[in-house]
Design a protein with these regions (language model features):
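Face-selective signature of the C-terminal outer-membrane beta-barrel domain
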Residues: 4-20, 50-207, 211, 217, ...
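Gram-negative outer-membrane beta-barrel transporters
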Residues: 294-299, 317-398
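Outer-membrane beta-barrel translocator domains and adjoining extracellular loop/strand segments
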Residues: 24-42, 86-95, 100, 146-154, ...
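Periplasmic-side early beta-strands and strand-to-turn transitions of outer-membrane beta-barrels
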Residues: 1-48
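Outer-membrane beta-barrel signature, preferentially recognizing the C-terminal barrel domain
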Residues: 167-171, 213, 242-292, 297-299, ...
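C-terminal beta-signal and adjacent terminal beta-strands/loops
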Residues: 242, 345, 396, 421-479
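Membrane-embedded beta-strands of outer-membrane beta-barrel proteins
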Residues: 59-61, 119-121, 178-180, 220-222, ...
């Protein structure tokens, strides 16, 4: 809803609701001995069956009042509610793969509910020199209520609780932020923006653990934009960023990929980073597309990774980490080759570094890819109701770091696409498909008897994980 209430007042409202019931995500894991590089003898086979119920709603809006040509006021609000109920059952087979002699080895349930409320008020002032000043305040409240349970079963069906502590709780955050920014021209071709934000927040946890902490951060930012040609622009920025804490990390859970309990860490704090970003944007003639080259560097204080907590691996903060990245992405119209066609592409190379808290050796960041590529081809067939899309994405391998484990994970390339039929001006029928390639990924895992710094190897395994492909039919309407 977008309504001009008075000549000086505009009101915008929106509402969204969703539900996604019993979304099955079957997955198979095959394990081999460390010396079985050809993957001929299966030691273990685990089949995961999952259900995932989701529902929620969001209500948002803003009111804008114009005092005169130079001054205006805007108030925004967002209210969100999300519910998620996940259940997983693992069926295991030990050395009898051909006979399919499976037994249920574990049952896991994860019930969570999220609430969010954001209120933001800002004033804007325009100046004769082309500058603009914005200042205001923002208030946010976030809440997570979560309950996790893990039950182990042996081949005889005898169950045993995992006995894990801190599996139920409520995490709440109250956050307040004041901000001011000034955007102004330096020359006819160069604009700059300087900004300063101050953030204060309190995070409290109740349930199995009772804890409350406060955080305060200054977040400066400076931007430059240079239109050195009509269709080319250079952008440069320096800023301090504060990471967003994942509230799930405060409460214990189970990592299905690593088959390890992940303890909750009530002492977790947000990471902070100084970031430098340099971009060059080239807009092709005749609205032919855009190509962007980006260089990025960041120094992170307290990156969030796995640390030892109470005999388990938990999510916690490390020392100082670094990230550097070069990225190329763009979108080009290819009507001369494919009428109505658009080709999108993306690729990046990056390097990361942090000091491992257990081995005291520098390494890359946990689960960070060194490179990624993407190709996306779409065609709106001229003079017809049809459009189609095919996309391809590939990744480098990633390393898995844990106080008690080291692993390597490499995903197979992913292929997907869609076909859309325009029924009328308001309705579309979409056919979507994904994961057409057979395997999902391959990996290697080394589990240590104690900290990995002792080099006392307990288990070495090779494995691959297979996710099933899917086909989805969707009716989409606009009213």
């Amino acid at each position: 809803l977008n309504s001009k209430i008075t000549p000086k007042d505009t009101l915008r409202l929106n509402m969204l609701t969703w539900f996604d019931s019993k979304e099955a995500e079957p997955q198979s894991q095959y394990y081999y001995g460390s010396g079985d590089s050809s993957k001929e003898d299966i030691l273990r086979y685990i089949n995961w069956n999952r259900t995932d119920d989701q529902d929620g709603w969001e209500i948002g809006g803003d009111w804008e009042h114009t005092f005169n040509s130079k001054h205006s006021f805007k108030f925004r609000s967002v209210l969100t509610k999300k519910n998620n109920d996940k259940k997983s059952i693992s069926k295991e087979n030990n050395g009898d793969y051909l006979n399919k002699n499976f037994y249920i080895s574990s049952k896991e349930s994860n019930d969570r509910s999220e609430n969010e409320r954001i209120l933001r008020a800002s004033f804007n002032t325009n100046f004769k020199n082309g500058g603009a000043l914005e200042y205001g305040v923002e208030s946010a409240y976030n809440k997570l209520e979560r309950s996790f349970a893990l039950l182990y079963l042996n081949p005889d069906g005898i169950s045993q609780d995992s006995g894990l502590f801190n599996t139920k709780g409520k995490v709440e955050e109250d956050r307040y932020e004041g901000f001011v920014s000034y955007n102004f021209p330096l020359t006819n071709l160069i604009r700059s923006e300087i900004a300063m934000n101050y953030e204060w927040s309190e995070i409290s946890q109740s349930g199995d653990v009772e804890l409350s902490r406060e955080f305060q951060y200054w977040k400066p930012r400076i931007d430059f934009k240079w239109d050195y040609r009509k269709n080319r622009q250079v952008r440069f920025s320096i800023l301090r960023n504060v990471g967003q804490i994942n509230f799930d990390d405060f409460i214990s859970s189970f990592d299905q990929f690593e088959e390890r309990i992940r303890a909750g860490n009530p002492d977790l704090k947000p990471s902070t980073a100084w970031e430098i970003n340099l971009e060059h944007e080239w807009r092709l003639a005749n609205d032919g597309g855009v190509i962007t080259l980006t260089g990025f560097a960041s120094q992170i204080d307290g990156p969030v990774e796995r640390v030892p907590v109470g005999g388990y691996a938990a999510v916690g903060n490390l020392g100082t980490g670094e990230i550097t990245q070069a990225k190329l992405d763009g979108s080009i119209r290819i009507g001369n080759v494919l009428p109505g066609g658009v080709l999108r592409f993306m690729g990046y190379l990056q390097s990361t570094e942090v000091l491992d808290p257990v081995t005291n050796i520098k390494r890359d960041l946990h689960f960070f890819r060194r490179w990624e590529t993407m190709l996306d081809l779409r065609q709106d067939i001229p003079n017809s109701r049809y459009s189609w899309r095919v996309w391809y994405r590939s990744y480098s391998q990633t390393n898995i770091y844990d106080p008690y484990l080291w692993g390597r994970w490499a995903e197979e390339p992913m292929l997907g696409g869609s076909l859309s039929v325009k029924i009328n001006s308001k309705l579309n029928l979409n056919f979507m498909f994904n994961r057409l390639l057979e395997k999902y990924g391959v990996g290697r895992k080394i589990v240590y008897n104690g900290f990995k710094s002792s080099n006392d190897i307990l288990i070495q395994e090779n494995f691959y994980v297979r996710n099933h492909g899917f086909i989805k039919i969707q009716l989409e309407g606009t009213f």
